[in-house]
Amino acid sequence: MIMPQSRLDVADNSGAREIMCIRVLNSGIGGKGLTTGGGGNKRYAHVGDIIVASVKDAAPRGAVKAGDVVKAVVVRTSHAIKRADGSTIRFDKNAAVIINNQGEPRGTRVFGPVARELRDRRFMKIVSLAPEVL
């Protein structure tokens, strides 16, 4: 569960290393790209949710710099994810992928496994870039 002030690792090569959640959006990918539903008042973000975040640590020559405000989709959480078949999955750390306003990743690679729930939320580009989908 990600809430404002939570810090997440960045699982792509956009240049950011760590981000801090500022806001959790009511969001998803609709027919015309990213839809945020006006921000909403969700308290927690789970896998597949979109957050607004501030870049806290960044690589020197990356596409994003420290202090930038970006949108990101949560791809891994340390809080267990319950699935319809009764199984649960959890990851060691919280991680996110930085996206643009159309819901596409800003980086060209995704590091580490991502949860299968991203496919249900229609983040197909992130799923295809990931080395493993759990």
From Swiss-Prot:
The keyword rRNA-binding applies. It holds the Pfam family Ribosomal_L14. Transmembrane segments: none annotated. It comes from the Bacteria. One of its GO terms (cellular component) is cytosolic large ribosomal subunit. InterPro entries: Ribosomal_uL14 (IPR000218), Ribosomal_uL14_bac-type (IPR005745), Ribosomal_uL14_CS (IPR019972), Ribosomal_uL14_sf (IPR036853). Keywords: Ribonucleoprotein, Ribosomal protein, RNA-binding, rRNA-binding. GO terms for molecular function: large ribosomal subunit rRNA binding; structural constituent of ribosome. GO terms for biological process: translation. Part of the 50S ribosomal subunit. Forms a cluster with proteins L3 and L19. In the 70S ribosome, L14 and L19 interact and together make contacts with the 16S rRNA in bridges B5 and B8. Belongs to the universal ribosomal protein uL14 family. NCBIfam families: rplN_bact. Binds to 23S rRNA. Forms part of two intersubunit bridges in the 70S ribosome. This is Large ribosomal subunit protein uL14. The lineage of its organism: Bacteria, Thermotogati, Deinococcota, Deinococci, Deinococcales. The gene is rplN.
